[in-house]
Amino acid sequence: MSIPNLSSVTQLLSIATGLVSTNNPVVVPVVTQILSVVSQLLSGTPASVVLPILQGLIPLLTNFPLILIQLLSVIAGLQGLPVPSSFSPDYKV
Protein backbone atom coordinates (compact mmCIF):
# COMPACT_ATOMS: atom_id res chain seq x y z
CA MET A 1 0.00 0.00 0.00
CA SER A 2 1.36 3.41 -0.91
CA ILE A 3 0.43 6.83 0.37
CA PRO A 4 -0.88 9.11 -2.37
CA ASN A 5 0.79 12.52 -2.52
CA LEU A 6 3.55 11.33 -0.16
CA SER A 7 6.01 13.84 -1.63
CA SER A 8 3.59 16.71 -0.95
CA VAL A 9 2.95 15.46 2.58
CA THR A 10 6.70 15.32 3.24
CA GLN A 11 7.22 18.82 1.83
CA LEU A 12 4.32 20.21 3.87
CA LEU A 13 5.75 18.72 7.07
CA SER A 14 9.09 20.33 6.21
CA ILE A 15 7.34 23.68 5.69
CA ALA A 16 5.53 23.37 9.03
CA THR A 17 8.81 22.53 10.77
CA GLY A 18 10.51 25.52 9.15
CA LEU A 19 7.73 27.83 10.28
CA VAL A 20 7.80 26.52 13.85
CA SER A 21 11.57 27.02 13.95
CA THR A 22 11.05 30.75 13.35
CA ASN A 23 9.63 30.91 16.89
CA ASN A 24 7.16 33.51 15.60
CA PRO A 25 3.64 33.21 17.06
CA VAL A 26 2.19 34.69 13.86
CA VAL A 27 2.83 31.38 12.07
CA VAL A 28 0.74 29.23 14.45
CA PRO A 29 -2.50 29.48 12.39
CA VAL A 30 -0.54 28.71 9.21
CA VAL A 31 1.07 25.64 10.78
CA THR A 32 -2.34 24.50 12.03
CA GLN A 33 -3.76 24.76 8.50
CA ILE A 34 -0.78 22.92 7.02
CA LEU A 35 -1.12 20.07 9.52
CA SER A 36 -4.82 19.87 8.73
CA VAL A 37 -4.00 19.53 5.03
CA VAL A 38 -1.41 16.83 5.82
CA SER A 39 -4.03 14.92 7.78
CA GLN A 40 -6.52 15.25 4.94
CA LEU A 41 -4.01 14.08 2.33
CA LEU A 42 -3.06 11.09 4.48
CA SER A 43 -6.77 10.26 4.78
CA GLY A 44 -7.05 10.13 1.00
CA THR A 45 -8.70 13.50 0.43
CA PRO A 46 -8.20 14.52 -3.22
CA ALA A 47 -5.68 17.27 -3.92
CA SER A 48 -8.44 19.38 -5.48
CA VAL A 49 -10.07 19.68 -2.04
CA VAL A 50 -6.95 20.87 -0.19
CA LEU A 51 -5.57 23.15 -2.91
CA PRO A 52 -7.82 26.11 -1.99
CA ILE A 53 -6.63 25.85 1.62
CA LEU A 54 -2.98 25.92 0.56
CA GLN A 55 -3.60 28.73 -1.92
CA GLY A 56 -5.18 30.73 0.91
CA LEU A 57 -1.90 30.54 2.82
CA ILE A 58 0.08 32.32 0.11
CA PRO A 59 -0.63 35.89 1.33
CA LEU A 60 0.21 34.86 4.89
CA LEU A 61 3.71 33.73 3.91
CA THR A 62 4.94 36.82 2.06
CA ASN A 63 7.34 37.56 4.95
CA PHE A 64 8.85 34.08 4.57
CA PRO A 65 9.96 33.98 0.91
CA LEU A 66 11.88 30.69 1.05
CA ILE A 67 8.98 28.93 2.73
CA LEU A 68 6.60 30.53 0.24
CA ILE A 69 8.67 29.06 -2.60
CA GLN A 70 8.33 25.63 -1.00
CA LEU A 71 4.56 26.06 -0.68
CA LEU A 72 4.26 27.11 -4.31
CA SER A 73 6.22 24.00 -5.24
CA VAL A 74 3.77 21.81 -3.30
CA ILE A 75 0.79 23.54 -4.91
CA ALA A 76 2.26 23.05 -8.37
CA GLY A 77 2.99 19.40 -7.63
CA LEU A 78 -0.54 18.76 -6.38
CA GLN A 79 -1.87 20.32 -9.58
CA GLY A 80 0.30 17.95 -11.59
CA LEU A 81 2.46 20.74 -12.96
CA PRO A 82 6.19 20.27 -13.49
CA VAL A 83 8.21 22.04 -10.82
CA PRO A 84 11.34 23.84 -12.10
CA SER A 85 14.46 22.98 -10.15
CA SER A 86 14.69 26.57 -8.91
CA PHE A 87 11.42 26.00 -7.07
CA SER A 88 12.30 22.66 -5.55
CA PRO A 89 12.26 22.55 -1.75
CA ASP A 90 16.00 21.82 -1.71
CA TYR A 91 16.84 25.02 -3.61
CA LYS A 92 19.10 27.30 -1.59
CA VAL A 93 19.44 31.03 -2.20
Curated annotation (Swiss-Prot):
- Please give the residues the UniProt entry marks as glycosylated: 5
Q: Does the keyword Signal belong to this entry?
A: yes
User: What residue range is the signal peptide?
Assistant: 1-22
The name on file for this protein is: Uncharacterized protein 368R
Q: Which UniProt keywords apply?
A: Glycoprotein, Signal
